[in-house]
Amino acid sequence: MLQYQIDRIDHQISDDRSQTGTFLIGPLERGQATTLGNSLRRVLMGGLEGSAVTAVRISGINHEYATIPGVREDVLDILLNCKQLSINSSNPETEIGRLVVNGPMEVKANDIQFSSQVEIVDGEKPIATIQEGHNLELEIHVERGVGYRPVDRRNQETTAIDLLQIDAVFMPVKRVNFTIDETAVAEGATGRERLTMEVVTDGSTSPDDAIAEAANQLIELFQPLATVTMVEEIPEEPEPSPEAQIPLEELNLSVRAYNCLKRAQVNSVSDLMGFSYEDLLEIKNFGSKSADEVIEALERIGISIPQSRTSV
């Protein structure tokens, strides 16, 4: 199998703290670059866990179409600014950040007070602008998750009326692009490919860590396929016929035949169906007359048993 390597050939951090990493992967067999590129891109864009603001409480406000006295931005603008926060929480439970400020002030992300388990990536992100003589009180809920989670209108009915929910984007990777180039090989050798991937994150994780996490998820996905085992289907036992469930008493046998069968632990027609004529004769004190009596009783309900053990 062809061995390849991955090299990060470029890494940039933007003013908003988003990170861009460019990776060179190769050499690869023809077709493998497309397989790797598509698989990694799918996981990077939708399979990685991230953090996002999921709800905001604003003092004195109970719906998103309101305005706040002394605040330049309306509630929708503030919710959008909170939604766009690049944030990283290491707590699997909901974290709540709080903000209580007086104007005049331009409120930025760094002004929100979180526990030590929450990191605000872009602390200079503007949240709101407050005029002199006014104040603003915010409560911001942060959760971890995967992918995109729209606002659950049904859940809104059971939450506090002043807790404004936000559709949450948990995806830490903002963009993934890849290109495939053919590499030069010796004459007569099979063609080789080289994969170049550009990964852009929101800064809550690095492109290197994002690639590593995506690769680990793919390994976990494909690993079980390396140990495929055949599972034998267990045939379902057929349901016993109604006749087979008839108790021995209902065959109206003679007392002698009935008692002999009972002593042989025969309690129903189902038990008798495991016997042949020869087997019946081997029951203690069970003669041919009793055996013939049993055969006739079974035939009356449409059941026959073989003459000998080897009969088919």
Curated annotation (Swiss-Prot):
Its EC number is 2.7.7.6. Residues 1-229 are annotated as: Alpha N-terminal domain (alpha-NTD). It comes from the Bacteria. It holds the Pfam family RNA_pol_A_bac. Gene3D superfamilies: 5' to 3' exonuclease, C-terminal subdomain (1.10.150.20), DNA-directed RNA polymerase, insert domain (2.170.120.12), RNA polymerase, RBP11-like subunit (3.30.1360.10). Residues 246-312 are annotated as: Alpha C-terminal domain (alpha-CTD). One of its GO terms (molecular function) is DNA binding. Keywords: DNA-directed RNA polymerase, Nucleotidyltransferase, Transcription, Transferase. It catalyses: RNA(n) + a ribonucleoside 5'-triphosphate = RNA(n+1) + diphosphate. One of its GO terms (cellular component) is cytoplasm. DNA-dependent RNA polymerase catalyzes the transcription of DNA into RNA using the four ribonucleoside triphosphates as substrates. Belongs to the RNA polymerase alpha chain family. The N-terminal domain is essential for RNAP assembly and basal transcription, whereas the C-terminal domain is involved in interaction with transcriptional regulators and with upstream promoter elements. NCBIfam families: PRK05182.2-2, PRK05182.2-5, rpoA. This is DNA-directed RNA polymerase subunit alpha. It comes from Prochlorococcus marinus subsp. pastoris (strain CCMP1986 / NIES-2087 / MED4).
